[in-house]
């Protein structure tokens, strides 16, 4: 996995501060704070750490942790890496501004197969609208007043308009959608781990359910090009952070050298040093053995007192 991305680059935008705001529709959204500053970074630089953090946010929900704990973890992830880019991840193309309408494959969040562009944009700009004019397949977008936003727009002029728009401070993503995506990734990981751990103890019908669940995991492969930097470098054209995480997670999921594992004690996702790694740390291993020993002793005491 490391070899695949060692000579690779990409880019995404994150802000230094995010907040959760409630819109007029009563829904909660994650959005940059009004004075937050953007930062352009390479998400492939620390890709294993990013995927692990995403999976562990999802595991908090799988393990039914309190909502305030989940909320804090989601905001922490977004501050580290930025929003997921759902606006460009969901349609059939990130260049949907070049078409008369937005076309959507089947997904968790939007039932419609197509939407008017203005209605679709409204899902991601619930507070302040961008100055966008849409007439048929023609689109224009005016950015003025905020020099930082103008500079950000100019930086990504060669990108699809919608991707560029999603880097603006006004952009927001529904909190429930973001949370669900993290949970979906954690579900995919646990499905894979349980399938192999329980293979001999489950029947064929259950195995088929696991296989179908895994078959549903996938995505559109991102495009790439080669840039001549200090040396030839693969540059991945991720039009959403979601797609980048999905691809990196996929490669990590099939990596035998450093397999993704769930800690037997704390349920934290970690990269194992070998296929049968069971604990994320020596501390967790020791605590697990202590609790296991105490459980045995209690059982023996009960038998002695019977």
Residue ranges of predicted features:
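Short helix-coil boundary/hinge micro-motifs
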Residues: 1-270
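BZIP DNA-binding basic region
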Residues: 245-306
